[in-house]
């Protein structure tokens, strides 16, 4: 099961609402975000909660529940805690924060879900992926380096490539979304809440890939 969710981004007000920080923006939008208690630790900010708490929050906020309206079932062998992490090392060194949590709590790479921006997916598309390439993403590169394997979960938010093919990619990912794009993303975030909850309460997130391997959440 997934035990650590790492939201990749850059720390600082100047990076708020930028394309590279789409994962942090997603975390901020979670209906149960105000339930999380953050601590500065492991070169980042970390919050922990039990799967049972998550199931109750998802039920209370109408993200996910059983047909009778009660909280979703938690697998019998679920871990006692799930951890949310926002590395504050800047994107290129995200792995330094992730590996501290992995080592401290004795996690395995398959227990890790990294949420990040994805140039190769259009805006409005999300993708749950196991392992694979890095797509030139420095946060993923850092994570692979410290885990010594590409075999970890990824939840990718499409940001698309710049309209101007000559635009520097570093400048593009550090630029802010337009107001219209932010409105689109709020819709995307609200639909992706269900995926995140299901992935964290699932014994095997691979069962979700057929539906969420590459899902377009907005109309053209």
Model-derived features with residue positions:
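Nucleotide and nucleotide-moiety/phosphate-recognizing core
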Residues: 1-131, 141-155, 162-168, 175, ...
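Hydrophobic alpha-helical segments within soluble ligand-binding/sensing domains
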Residues: 136-139
């Amino acid at each position: 099961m997934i035990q650590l969710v790492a939201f990749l981004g850059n720390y600082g007000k100047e990076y708020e609402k930028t394309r590279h920080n789409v994962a942090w923006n997603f975390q901020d939008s979670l209906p149960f975000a105000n339930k999380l208690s953050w601590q500065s630790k492991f070169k980042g900010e970390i919050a922990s909660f039990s799967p049972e708490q998550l199931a109750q929050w998802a039920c209370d906020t109408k993200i996910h529940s059983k047909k009778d309206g009660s909280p979703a079932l938690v697998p019998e062998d679920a871990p006692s805690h799930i951890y949310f992490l926002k590395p504050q090392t800047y994107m290129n060194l995200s792995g330094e924060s992730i590996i501290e949590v992995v080592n401290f709590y004795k996690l395995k790479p398959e227990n890790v879900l990294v949420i990040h921006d994805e140039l190769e997916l259009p805006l409005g598309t999300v993708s749950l992926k196991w392992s694979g390439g890095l797509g030139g993403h420095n946060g993923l590169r850092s994570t692979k380096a410290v885990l010594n394997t590409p075999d970890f979960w990824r939840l990718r938010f499409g940001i698309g490539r710049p309209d101007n093919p000559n635009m520097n990619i570093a400048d593009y990912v550090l630029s802010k979304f337009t107001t219209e794009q932010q409105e689109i993303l709020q819709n995307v975030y609200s639909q992706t809440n269900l995926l995140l909850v299901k992935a964290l309460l699932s014994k095997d997130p691979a069962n979700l890939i057929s539906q969420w391997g590459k899902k377009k959440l907005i109309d053209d």
